[in-house]
Amino acid sequence: MAKISILPKDDRTNGWSAILPKRPITPALKGTQHADWVVIGAGFAGLAAARRLGQNRPNDKVILIEAHEVGEGASGRNSGFAIDLPHNVGSSLQELEGSHRFIRLSRAAIKYHEDAVAAGNIQCNWAERGKYHAA
């Protein structure tokens, strides 16, 4: 099997990772592997897919492959805020209806994540702080 030698450049400027304790090095996958599912990439989408497969197919073997560190790329460089209000609500009836749909969807997404944190007993300092929007 060929070894991959060309990987995306990592400029090591992820500020969030810089404030975390050093993570243990995970050994490279070796030998022949057998899995029902292989997820490539451990960013938001890959982690969500692997987690969901584990929930929906608990007897299946899932392998998650990441070239670098989990959540270290673009997924780990966001601000991590979840807000339920759009930045610009608008003033027309159509814009207000769209904003209400957005608010319902956003609140459902926040609730989904809150439930996942509680169910997984994830220690992440989850806190509802509201939103301040000042001029």
PLM regions and their residue ranges:
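A structure-centric signal for secondary-structure junctions around beta-strands
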Residues: 34, 59, 76, 128-129
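Glycine-rich Rossmann-fold phosphate-binding loop(s) that bind the pyrophosphate
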Residues: 37, 41-47, 67
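Glycine-rich FAD pyrophosphate-binding loop
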Residues: 54-77
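Extreme N-terminal leader/targeting segments of oxidoreductases
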Residues: 1-37, 55-61
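Dinucleotide-binding Rossmann-like beta1-alpha1 core, especially the glycine-rich loop
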Residues: 83-135
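Short, flexible active-site-proximal loops enriched in glycine and acidic residues
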Residues: 71-79, 120-125
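Short coil-to-beta-strand
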Residues: 36, 75-90
